[in-house]
Each structure stands twice: as structure tokens, then as C-alpha cells.
Design a protein with these regions (language model features):
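Glycine-rich cofactor phosphate-binding loops and adjacent beta1-alpha1 units
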Residues: 171, 198, 214, 219-269
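Redox-cofactor binding/interface segments in oxidoreductases and associated redox assembly factors
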Residues: 83, 181, 249
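Iron-sulfur (Fe-S) cluster-binding segments and ferredoxin-like electron-carrier domains
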Residues: 42, 96-116, 120
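Mid-domain Rossmann-like dinucleotide-binding core that forms the NAD(H)/NADP(H) cofactor-binding site
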Residues: 80, 130, 143-229, 233
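Glycine/Thr-rich phosphate-binding loops of Rossmann-like dinucleotide-binding domains
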Residues: 91, 189, 256-258
Length: 269
């Protein structure tokens, strides 16, 4: 099959690689129909990690189940599925407690967790390919309605929307509160949308890329362009001198100062 293969910093290639195969009876093989590029894929692409050449990128995946292991009960060949980016077993104590990111079966010592196509997160191939092996398929495959009408919407469920939503969970957003979202990339926009779903009264999205701020406005948020001045001052002016009740950082360690220098250790408080 064809797959996107990492060759080294800022170098990838579409190459022929071996087709994935059923290894365990709980596996399925999915034919990929949509896969997204994550900002964390770019971390590897830019050489910010110790990713080894040969890795296939892609942890935001969906597609059609093509082959099913004998131990799989909840999905069958032909099902459309979306695949949450974090691989987990579904039956350990942590998974049963809803803490699948800390799966006791998948998270081997010395790893950051389990994910498709990511350095240090297990032996799972990425989905920027024609086919993908999915372990523990009863837990890691989310069945979808038939048809392609909402293909682009469902692709957001693999990572982008739940990551944005989780940020509002961590922030504790409650109905009627005001919220500031720093960063209007895909995750930041989904954080703003999630805050809206949670009933936030006003949502401010800080960025300086015009089309991203336009998208924030389309979602019902109030765009704050930091090229126009201190974003904190702009927000407090809009709130009669008060700050927001909640905030979320959708920029991460690539946050930069006004000078353009990155400050990876900066924490918003």
C-alpha cells in the first residue's frame, strides 16, 4: 500500500510499504477514507522530536472496516468507523474508569501513551496510508452512520473536536460564564465551539490570522486580533475591566513572545 513516510526533518515521501495484517484476534484492518494532519505531526516533521525515519504519520483517522479478527464483536466488515487517536484496551481499571489515556495494557513503561503513528507512543502504524491495523477494535472503533454526507464532520471526532472539548472540561466552563481561547487553529476553534455548547455567555478567541479569526466569528465567538494591541486589555475593555471566568491555551509549547521567539515553558495562569 501507499503511505506517508517520515524520512527526516522536513522531509516526507509517499512510498510503498507492507500492508497491515491482523496480528491479534481483537484487531481489525480499516481502509482509510479520511485522515487529518495534526499540529503534533508537524512537530515530528520539523524535527522537534526524536522520531526515527520510516515512521508513518497519522493519528486522526476514519474509514471502512475491511477485515475483522475472530475476537471482535462490535464492528463488522463494511462498517464506517472513526478512530480516536489514543489507543487503549477498554478493559483495564483505568479504561473502565474513563481514563483511557492512562491505559494499563497499552501504555508501556517509558512511553507517553498509545497512539497511531507517533514517536514514543507504541508500535502502532499511522493512518496517513491506505490501510491501518486497529488493535482492541471493540474499544477503538466508533461506528458511524452509513454514507459519506458527513465525512468531514466525523473526521473531527478522531482528535480535533474532543481535544478542544476536553480543554473546556479542564477549564471547568459553566453556563453563563465568559471564556478566552488563546489560539484559533483547529483545536482552538473547537474549544470555542465547545464553550458555546456548554452555554458560555461570551467567548473571546485570540489570534492574528485573519481567516482564522473570521472562522471564530462564524462560530459565534468574538475575535481578538493581538496585532491590534494587548489582547488582555482588549478583553478587559470588552468586559468593563474584568477578565474572563475561564480560559484555555490552544497554542502549546510553540507559544511566542511579541518578538517572535518561542517560549515552550510558558504556562498561562
Amino acid at each position: 500500500m501507499k503511505a506517508v513516510v517520515y524520512k527526516g526533518p522536513r522531509e516526507v515521501a509517499v512510498e510503498e510499504v507492507d500492508d497491515p495484517a491482523i496480528v491479534d484476534p481483537t484487531d481489525v484492518i480499516v481502509r482509510i477514507t479520511s485522515t487529518a494532519i495534526c499540529g503534533s505531526d508537524l512537530h515530528m516533521y520539523e524535527g522537534r522530536t526524536d522520531a526515527e525515519p520510516g515512521i508513518t504519520f497519522g493519528h486522526e483517522n476514519m474509514g471502512i472496516v475491511e477485515e475483522v479478527g475472530q475476537g471482535v464483536a462490535t464492528v463488522k466488515s463494511g462498517d464506517r468507523v472513526v478512530l480516536p487517536f489514543n489507543v487503549a484496551c477498554g478493559f483495564c481499571d483505568n479504561c473502565r474508569a474513563g481514563k483511557s489515556a492512562f491505559c494499563l495494557t497499552v501504555n508501556e513503561p517509558g512511553t507517553a501513551g498509545g497512539a497511531y503513528g507517533y514517536v514514543g507512543m507504541g508500535p502502532y502504524g499511522g493512518g496517513q496510508a491506505e490501510y491501518l491495523r486497529v488493535p482492541f477494535a471493540d474499544y477503538n472503533c466508533v461506528p458511524l452512520p452509513a454514507g459519506e454526507e458527513h465525512e468531514k464532520d466525523f473526521a473531527m471526532l478522531a482528535d480535533i473536536f474532543p481535544t478542544g472539548y476536553h480543554s473546556t472540561e479542564l477549564a471547568g466552563v459553566q453556563p453563563g460564564e465568559t471564556v478566552a481561547v488563546y489560539g484559533a487553529g483547529p483545536v482552538g476553534l473547537m474549544a470555542a465551539y465547545s464553550a458555546q455548547l456548554k452555554g458560555a455567555s461570551r467567548i473571546f478567541v485570540v489570534d492574528h490570522v485573519p481567516n482564522r479569526l473570521d472562522l471564530a466569528r462564524d462560530l459565534g465567538a468574538e475575535p481578538i486580533n493581538f496585532d491590534d494591541g494587548d489582547p488582555v486589555q482588549q478583553i478587559t475593555d470588552a468586559l468593563d475591566g474584568f477578565g474572563t471566568d475561564r480560559g484555555t491555551d490552544a497554542v502549546g509549547y510553540q507559544a511566542t513572545a511579541a518578538s517572535g521567539e518561542e517560549h515552550p515553558a510558558t504556562v498561562l495562569n
